């Protein structure tokens, strides 16, 4: 799928090899939107790589704010460009460390190495290195990056600025 869940699983396999299995847990959040075969493929991949203790699948979340709050790192592994990239914006607004592919909207919303990390789209090794970097950062650096991310989003996406930009387009 274009969301890159299979790429994420490949990257987590590499993270496990590097850091060990007790260093992290990952959640793949969101329903399969009728793509039952794809979800079964993801589950098989997780089993094949011995990641069933690290990766959990959650179909639906009623409280995304809480999901972000309990996360240390948020990953958007899209392999096709997203026009906006809502996950990256939401994660930054919640002061979370975001790791996203270097295509589409993420290039506009994330300042690499300052408000989050961008990895080479479609490259599991590149993604795994960013995840490892995020998992091994000290808490002060993670918090600072989160605050920078929130500040970045507030500057770029306040209502007044968005209205002016929209008005300017139609003018």
Q: Regions from the language model: what does each represent?
A:
Residues 112-113, 117-124, 133-139:
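Conserved acidic donor-binding segment of nucleotide-sugar-dependent glycosyltransferases
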Residues 1-16, 40, 125:
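A conserved mid-protein helix/loop that constitutes part of the nucleotide-sugar donor-binding site
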Residues 126, 133, 140-156, 162-168:
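A short, well-ordered alpha-helix in the C-terminal region of glycosyltransferases
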